[in-house]
Amino acid sequence: MLLATFKLCAGSSYRHMRNMKGLRQQAVMAISQELNRRALGGPTPSTWINQVRRRSSLLGSRLEETLYSDQELAYLQQGEEAMQKALGILSNQEGWKKESQQDNGDKVMSKVVPDVGKVFRLEVVVDQPMERLYEELVERMEAMGEWNPNVKEIKVLQKIGKDTFITHELAAEAAGNLVGPRDFVSVRCAKRRGSTCVLAGMATDFGNMPEQKGVIRAEHGPTCMVLHPLAGSPSKTKLTWLLSIDLKGWLPKSIINQVLSQTQVDFANHLRKRLESHPASEARC
């Protein structure tokens, strides 16, 4: 695949390629994504994670009809990188330690990942079909502040293609105001591979959203949510949320760990209440 793509690029004259900016960008993207696929490939203990990681390389290996700018291509590649890194972390089952477990089975685990830091993993089962969760978490993303008190506001700043977004999120104070207001600028991508939906993201730069006065610019990533039907109960959804955040500022690690772990527990509770109180529309993952 990589050799064929390279021959395709080299077979055209320099002058011809110079006049086809869009094709050149897409060919470079195809080579880059194929390299990433080979570097990140390999067996994983989880079939659905392996399926997503393998098929997600199609984003770069297909020449899109839409012509993207250099910056848009960079955002697309960032989103792909976030997905690959996050799924790679989830696929490694070793080293996870239990932080908490609720009476309803909701479980938070954590581990330290080299070059990333401490990450948190929430595993829950929601009594709603996967399409309903996708609708709330992606299609109605900007409404999250209505039902999640840990989020004041989410705005989609730019949409790139069908499944990549640049977002600005303003988080509420936490831990009795010991953690002041934070905001995040992130690139997010949402994809479906077979019966699995993945929502991934990481911090990025966006010129039209500089740091705000009185708010600390924190950083996400890599992070992701994985949704798939519960085995044997397709009307229920298994949700796995990998959370990795650098809150910045001077905060004790004990406070950070407490805030992030509790954030995941609270999120699951608020999400269930939202799904129960608001009917589904026709959105599909």
UniProtKB/Swiss-Prot annotation:
Phosphoserine sites (modified residues): S57, S195
Location within or outside the cell: Mitochondrion
Phosphoprotein among keywords: yes
Pathway recorded for this protein: Steroid metabolism; cholesterol metabolism
GO molecular function: cholesterol binding; cholesterol transfer activity
Span of domain START: 67-280
Extent of the transit peptide: 1-63
Disulfide bonds: none
Tissue specificity note: Expressed in gonads, adrenal cortex and kidney.
Record: disease: Adrenal hyperplasia 1: The most severe form of adrenal hyperplasia. It is a condition characterized by onset of profound adrenocortical insufficiency shortly after birth, hyperpigmentation reflecting increased production of pro-opiomelanocortin, elevated plasma renin activity as a consequence of reduced aldosterone synthesis, and male pseudohermaphroditism resulting from deficient fetal testicular testosterone synthesis. Affected individuals are phenotypic females irrespective of gonadal sex, and frequently die in infancy if mineralocorticoid and glucocorticoid replacement are not instituted.
Subunit structure comment from the entry: May interact with TSPO.
Name recorded for this polypeptide: Steroidogenic acute regulatory protein, mitochondrial
Organism: Homo sapiens (Human)
